[in-house]
From Swiss-Prot:
GO BP, sorted A to Z: cell division; proteolysis involved in protein catabolic process
Oligomer and partners: Component of the ClpX-ClpP complex. Forms a hexameric ring that, in the presence of ATP, binds to fourteen ClpP subunits assembled into a disk-like structure with a central cavity, resembling the structure of eukaryotic proteasomes.
Family matches, as InterPro entries: AAA+_ATPase, ATP-dep_Clp_protease_ClpX, ATPase_AAA_core, Clp_ATPase_C, Clp_protease_ATP-bd_su_ClpX, ClpX_bact, P-loop_NTPase, Znf_CppX_C4
Any one Pfam family match given in the protein's UniProt record, by short name: AAA_2
The entry's keywords: ATP-binding, Chaperone, Metal-binding, Nucleotide-binding, Zinc
Chloroplast keyword on record: no
Name of this chain's protein: ATP-dependent Clp protease ATP-binding subunit ClpX
HAMAP family, alphabetized: ClpX
Any GO CC annotation of this UniProt entry: HslUV protease complex
Homology family: Belongs to the ClpX chaperone family.
């Protein structure tokens, strides 16, 4: 313990020995002084210890209706998928709270398959679920995975991403959510098992089986391939919720063929024509996934199948404007920081939606379209102090015309911002 003061009579911190002139604040107690730096250090130590002792529990898991309501704030449409996800997630964490057994009845895990076109909201739904539940969340790309012994990522690297998202708190990671994207890309190339190796297809499905079902996996802390004499992080995947998403391009004819066969048998081609193109995926069954190329054991690990519909023009316009973090609101906020008001005319929003449909990118392509439209504006406006308002019109999107700019004196410019 340091003396309270030095030879010059200056007060000192009793812990680090710094004088009152070397620190911002010195707090006095009964026979002791402590500086602001030591207080901050002590606070960090206490918080770390409390975080370690805090057991990860889910006593107040939102009810399915509440989960759906929160999803509605961020994701437009897709009501059936939201309901399926809300129920599956609620049951999953209810199962964790019950320690997987109720009166000796073991509750099985319900991983989820999300099937829908690109840009329909699969990843956003999974991300929002993790945010609602405040659990670690990781996204993995199935196309980068290969089975053990081949060039590519081991499936255990998926778990490493979750551990990293949990700041290496393994107990917390063991109750997280992993979203595996592009799972349709690991379908085997034909319905019949082949004697040749399918390194990026069936082999990956086989490798994923154990972690989907629940196992204690050994994860290399630095990622990459496993090798002998290496330290591993042990993680139990029993309570990790896996959501596997994919576009499953080409599954529609499989579904139509089955629907035709089941309904009238001979002459099913005619019946297929009556199936609503937009709602084909709503009829998907495990047997369709089997014909598509997923192996039976893998399908069995994904008992909940939720489909997402393609987004139409109205849905895309709603996505641009209605969610809490809608793109229009984001760009309006960006320009507001430069003291400029941004307005999107209704015609502009409709044209943006049409472009996204033409490009077949769904909601995912909306940002890139707006970024392209706003490039010149966002380049010029920070240097222009005379502009009060920027208006994107139908012509701005459809004909690549310059946005309307309103000056502070009310003058409207229809030319480029450099005018």
């Amino acid at each position: 313990m340091f003396k309270f003061n030095d030879e010059k009579g200056q007060l000192k911190c009793s812990f680090c020995g710094k004088t009152q002139t070397q620190v911002r604040k010195l707090v006095a107690g009964p026979g002791v002084y402590i500086c602001d730096e030591c207080i901050e250090l002590c606070t960090e130590i206490v918080q770390e210890e409390l975080a370690k002792d805090e057991e990860v529990e889910f006593k107040d898991v939102p009810k399915p209706v509440e989960i759906r309501e929160i999803l509605d704030e961020y994701v437009i449409g897709q009501d059936n998928a939201k309901k399926a996800l809300a129920v599956a997630v609620y049951n999953h964490y209810k199962r964790i709270n019950s320690n997987s057994k109720i009166d000796d009845v073991e509750l099985a895990k319900s991983n989820i398959a999300l099937i829908g076109p690109t840009g329909s909201g699969k990843t956003l739904l999974a991300q929002t679920l993790a945010r609602i539940l405040n659990v670690p969340f990781a996204i993995a790309d199935a196309t980068s995975l290969t089975e053990a012994g081949y060039v590519g990522e081991d499936v255990e690297n998926i778990l490493l991403k979750l551990i990293q998202a949990a700041d290496y708190d393994v107990e917390k990671a063991e109750k997280g959510i992993i979203y595996i994207d592009e799972i349709d890309k690991v379908a085997r190339k034909s319905e019949n098992p082949s004697i040749t190796r399918d390194v990026s297809g069936e082999g990956v499905q086989q490798a994923l089986l154990k972690i989907l079902e629940g196992t204690v996996a050994s994860v290399p802390p630095q990622g990459g391939r496993k090798h002998p004499h290496q330290e591993f992080i042990q993680i139990d995947t029993t309570n990790i919720l896996f959501i596997c998403g994919g576009a499953f391009d080409g599954i529609e004819p499989i579904i139509k063929r089955r629907l035709g066969e089941k309904v009238i048998g001979f002459g099913s081609e005619k019946k297929n024509a009556d199936v609503n193109e937009k709602h084909v995926l709503s009829h998907v069954l495990p047997e369709d996934l089997l014909r598509f190329g997923l192996i039976p054991e893998f399908i069995g690990r994904l008992p909940v199948i939720a489909n997402l519909e393609p987004l139409d023009e109205d849905a895309l316009v709603d996505i641009l404007t209605k969610p809490k973090n809608a793109l229009v609101k984001q760009f309006q906020k960006l320009l507001e920081l430069d003291d400029v008001e941004l307005e999107f005319e209704e015609g502009a929003l409709i044209e943006i939606a049409k472009k996204a449909i033409e490009r077949k990118t769904g909601a995912r392509g909306l940002r890139s379209i707006i970024e392209g439209l706003m490039l010149e504006v966002m380049f010029e406006l920070p240097s222009r102090k005379d502009i009060e308002k920027c208006i994107l019109t139908k012509e701005t999107v459809a004909d690549n015309a310059a946005p309307k700019l309103v000056l502070q004196d009310g003058t409207v410019l229809d030319t480029k911002t450099s005018a």
